[in-house]
Amino acid sequence: MPRYKLIIEYDGAPYCGWQIQDNGPSVQGALETAVKAICGKFVRVNGAGRTDAGVHALAQVAHCDIAKEFAPGRLRDGLNAHLRPHPIGVLSAEIVPDDFEARFSAIKRHYVYRISNRRANLALQIGKVWRLPRRLDTDAMHAAAQRLVGKHDFTTFRDTECQAKSPDKTLDQLDVIRDGDNVSIITSARSFLHSQVRSMVGSLVWVGEGRWSADDLAAALAARRRTACGPVAPPDGLYLVKVDY
């Protein structure tokens, strides 16, 4: 039975997240419905990152085992046809070894959080960025962000319902870059805790607004207490960009 690796792009706004849940439609559910329409029976589609409600993906990775062998291009096109009108696109499909696991074979995940730092209302980016009208000091944000890079106990920056066994994670990158009114917060790690990226972004915004210093951010990390965290950024601006294997 061949195993297929899929690269998937999606707008997370209409979904309760990647994973199938009882409280609404999911990206995983839409994909599994499309696969069933092609092969005639249920097939589990496993993703590399279980993105939260409203979070987008530019290149989510998934794998599935399908009894019938399809040419990769034909499978891609068939899935895209059955996914309409969902805002989900299968960018590519390929046959991979049986031991490939989209989630557990991953060695690094890359995310970007996008902020529109302007006073004007959003017109073309509604639901795709976090609009903040107050000018952010992105140099201060970037400098403070480096205090979070490395291996730490990220209890402060994880959701209270996070099911990870350990709060320890190694953050490989956390950069804050400005391009005009557009601010990108770029981060990468082998894996992240539930709501970790959005929690770090919200706290960095407090630094950018002058409410916190870099030392305040470091103190919040050291507190290892969820209540020490700044605000949690909305999901609108968060994108899963790439997964490395």
Curated annotation (Swiss-Prot):
It comes from the Bacteria. InterPro entries: PsdUridine_synth_cat_dom_sf, PsdUridine_synth_TruA, PsdUridine_synth_TruA_a/b_dom, PsdUridine_synth_TruA_C, TruA/RsuA/RluB/E/F_N. GO terms for biological process: tRNA pseudouridine synthesis. Pfam families: PseudoU_synth_1 (PF01416). Gene3D superfamilies: Pseudouridine synthase I, catalytic domain, C-terminal subdomain, Pseudouridine synthase I, catalytic domain, N-terminal subdomain. Disulfide bonds: none annotated. Homodimer. This is tRNA pseudouridine synthase A. It comes from Rhodopseudomonas palustris (strain BisB18).
